[in-house]
């Protein structure tokens, strides 16, 4: 099958592989993106198990109470529009009042004038002339703490983190929000990683070890080590704490008397 330049670019952006390596992997995978990523990982042309850090810079996140919303736009020109920013805060407040814990629930939430969030976004898109949509929404019923991060001072917040927790050490809770914003964990703990994902990582790690010529008798040990690295990168509680990299996030939270129940991280462009 013919491989397009756009497909090659997408794979290069996601893996950091060279153009010819990316094209060869896509050809071998018959255009299957995920399979091509694995081929590059096994061959050593891509670094292991990382989502692309390249994110579109458009849209914003907004929060109210125990709710966090992510609203997407096509350009950062719109993201800086005062009417767009005001609408985002109005939408966050409506989502919080409704206890909307999903995108669909937030779109159906009522605004003060009786219209819905979905209606508001449709009207705003028509007025501005650009696609605007609610990309995601979350609401926590327990103790919640929110952190909003600006990638650029001339733009509204584009990364939002919300955690649900037990404990009284707000400084520690805020610190873990900074950790989530900076390190983009995918899961809270390794217990939450789906079994098929773990098995996939085991398979890829074994293939990489064999490609490197490692003796078969030590491959299981190598796989366990690389799987530990995967958990350390992708599971929040296993990550080294940015406040003290000699401790894990789990250790710093335990010392602070804080239990983290769950978290969400929204980022403009994701």
UniProtKB/Swiss-Prot annotation:
Keyword entries, A-Z: Cytoplasm, Elongation factor, Protein biosynthesis
Entry's Gene Ontology cellular component terms: cytoplasm
InterPro entries xref list: EF-Ts_dimer_sf (IPR036402), Transl_elong_EFTs/EF1B (IPR001816), Transl_elong_EFTs/EF1B_dimer (IPR014039), Transl_elong_Ts_CS (IPR018101), UBA-like_sf (IPR009060)
Main location: cytoplasm
Alphabetized Pfam families for the sequence: EF_TS (PF00889)
Top-level taxon of the source organism: Bacteria
Similarity comment: Belongs to the EF-Ts family.
Protein role: Associates with the EF-Tu.GDP complex and induces the exchange of GDP to GTP. It remains bound to the aminoacyl-tRNA.EF-Tu.GTP complex up to the GTP hydrolysis stage on the ribosome.
Protein name: Elongation factor Ts
Species the sequence originates in: Cutibacterium acnes (strain DSM 16379 / KPA171202)
Gene name for this UniProt entry: tsf
